[in-house]
Swiss-Prot record:
UniProt superkingdom: Bacteria
Gene Ontology molecular function, alphabetical: rRNA binding; structural constituent of ribosome
Identification of the protein by name: Small ribosomal subunit protein uS4
Family of this protein: Belongs to the universal ribosomal protein uS4 family.
CDD domains: S4
NCBIfam families in alphabetical order: PRK05327.1, rpsD_bact
Underlying gene: rpsD
S4 RNA-binding domain residues: 97-163
Region Disordered, annotated ranges: 35-54
Length: 207
């Protein structure tokens, strides 16, 4: 299954929740707030979702939020399931460790989709080595920096001026002057987005 490439606002409407897939535009121009119902014809009262339907909706919401294909998402579930501990928490921690997500958390992109493009275009170094794989899993102690040649571009010049307002999670640190971040520690269950119920994903894939 390929990555979703249609109107991302439809994903929010299908999930029944605001997923912030378009970054700042989700604050100023949110289609979901105007049209929260699912896309398509509205025929009478909405049907009540079955347990399986609720599990699917939650799984899709998490997958869309992190911008992953079904195959990629299923692989991450398999990695989480092979680890000791709570599978749902393991999976969310792995998702948070993705390089594109770390850039998003640091404020280098207003959305995970934008952060993914930054990685794929070769602007990012991890411990001094160019890394252009968005799904790369960061490790404790690693440093994420912007290439010196990239800092001269208009995007990163603007970013350096505006990044002050971004709140950084406790497991990361940010040097705003050098546009670099460091992984102080790996994220834990307490850092997981409270909107997501990863246990429903475990139940979905366990059937």
């Amino acid at each position: 299954m390929s990555r979703e490439t249609g109107a991302v606002c439809r994903m929010c409407r299908r999930s029944g929740d605001k997923l912030f897939l378009k970054g700042d535009k989700c604050v100023t121009k949110c289609v979901f707030e105007k049209r929260p119902k699912p896309p398509g014809p509205q025929l009478g009262r909405p049907r009540r979702l079955s347990d399986r339907g609720q599990q699917l909706r939650q799984k899709q919401s998490i997958r869309w939020s992190y911008g992953m294909t079904e195959r990629q998402f299923r692989r991450f579930f398999g990695l989480a399931n092979a680890q000791p501990g709570v599978t749902g928490d393991n999976m969310m921690i792995l998702l948070e460790r993705r390089l594109d997500n770390v850039l998003f958390r640091l404020g280098f992109g207003t959305s995970r989709a934008q952060a993914r493009q930054i990685v794929m275009h070769g602007h990012i170094l991890v411990n001094g080595q160019k890394t252009d794989i968005p799904s790369y899993l960061i490790k404790e102690g690693q440093e994420i920096t912007v290439r010196e040649t990239s800092k001269a571009t208009a995007y990163f010049k603007t970013l350096a001026e505006n990044i002050e307002a971004k709140a950084i999670p406790g497991w990361l640190s940010l040097d705003r002057k050098t546009l670099s971040g460091k992984v102080i520690s790996l994220p834990n269950a307490g850092d997981i987005d409270a909107r997501f119920d990863a246990q429903t994903v475990v139940e979905y894939y366990s059937r």
